[in-house]
Amino acid sequence: LEDINTKLKERAGELNIEIDIFQSNSEAEIIEKIQSLTSDFTIINPAAFTHSSVAIRDSLVAKKIRFIEVHLSNVFARESFRKNSFFSDVAVGVISGLGPEGYIAALNYINQSEKISR
């Protein structure tokens, strides 16, 4: 996780993007973080909550935050229950199976998207 965070910070610096990295295994803490966000775009790896948390999904939708869903592993190459996501249909995009590079790809997309929308 530290390596991913370091790479993200480095890339964000190159793109002149301010980022806030947050990780929690607590559904309540994740929801509180989402509710406190001031940006309109985020990257989320919901991990096991992908298949179980309507509450996290609802908080993203209620806050009207555009987001990219990222998974380190290819969830479609794993157990069948992992193919169901409560987030994918409301995400701007989904990146799955690219390992840590998925986060960099998401950050690059956000950078490009924000340039276009200005």
Question: What name fits each language-model region?
Answer:
Residues L1-G13:
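Short catalytic helix/loop segments, enriched in acidic residues and glycine
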Residues E18-A28:
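Short beta->alpha junction loops
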Residues D20-F22, A77-R118:
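Short, glycine-/small-residue-rich phosphate/pyrophosphate-handling segment
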Residues N25-S26, A48, L98:
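Short beta->alpha linker loops
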Residues E29-A47:
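Short, electropositive alpha-helical surface patch
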Residues K33-L37, S59, A106:
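CheY-like receiver
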Residues L37-S39, V61-A62, N84-D89:
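Short, hinge-like loop/turn segments at secondary-structure boundaries
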Residues F41-F76:
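Mid-chain, well-packed structural core segment of small domains
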